[in-house]
A protein has these predicted regions:
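Structured beta-strand-rich core segments of catalytic domains in phosphoester-bond hydrolases
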Residues: 1-26, 32
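A short catalytic or substrate-binding loop motif that flags glycine-/basic-rich loops and adjacent residues
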Residues: 8-13, 38, 106-107, 119-123, ...
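Surface polyanion/phosphate-binding segment centered on an Asp-His-Pro turn
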Residues: 19-21, 57-59, 121-123, 127-128, ...
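Metal-dependent phosphoesterases centered on the DNase I-like endonuclease/exonuclease/phosphatase
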Residues: 42-133, 186-192
Length: 192
């Protein structure tokens, strides 16, 4: 069972983070909804909250309304215009050192999590992201059958060996977009 130790709610309702213990091992779970007009500030706030989580196995999941790979993740396929939101999302995932856990286990599978009746299209908009330092703990991933929603749930299985290992620290590149932070960091580097 999951023993909760803490919760953080986004004031705008975009994400909720819960942390606690599973079989005595620290875990962080973040549930995300990013609206279709993906704003850099929303990703920045989410990134800061992720970096503030206590050490533990971390899973960030939800509807990001963006595509990692338009060729594999959209029925529209290759050749359609790559949207700025897709590019921003991929850059954000990379800047935090996150991996698409489902894609790691299904590198060539074409499977969708969202159906748009209005557009007559299918997309994979729902992701389970994990730090690259935790991805070795996964034992599998799959898309589950759709229920009443227009989105299908995604499931990963996590083992427990090595789960207490602390992840490597990494500077979130989103901080460098803040002029005051970049100036302060530059002064510290020159002083060092």
């Amino acid at each position: 069972p999951f023993i909760p130790l803490g919760t953080k709610l986004d004031p705008h309702g975009r994400f909720v983070a819960k942390w606690g213990l599973v079989e005595g091992i620290a875990h962080n779970f973040v549930s995300v909804y990013i609206p279709p007009q993906l704003h850099a500030s929303t990703l920045g706030d989410l990134g800061k909250s992720i970096l503030d989580l206590p050490p533990g196995v971390t899973v960030i999941g939800g509807d990001f309304n963006a595509l990692m790979d338009r060729g594999k993740d959209s029925s529209s396929g290759v050749g359609t215009q790559v949207l700025a939101t897709d590019t921003r999302f991929k850059e954000w995932v990379g800047s935090l050192g996150l991996c698409d856990a489902w894609r790691i286990w299904n590198p060539n599978l074409i499977q969708y999590t969202h159906t748009s009746a209005a557009h007559g299209s299918h997309s994979r908009l729902d992701y389970l992201l994990m730090p690259s330092t935790d991805i070795h703990l996964t034992c599998g991933a799959r898309v589950l059958p759709r229920g009443l929603s227009d989105h299908s749930p995604v499931q990963i299985s996590i083992g427990k060996e090595g789960a207490q290992r602390r992840p490597m620290w990494r500077l979130n590149a989103w901080f460098l977009q803040d002029p005051q932070f970049a100036k302060h960091m530059g002064e510290d580097i020159r002083q060092y």
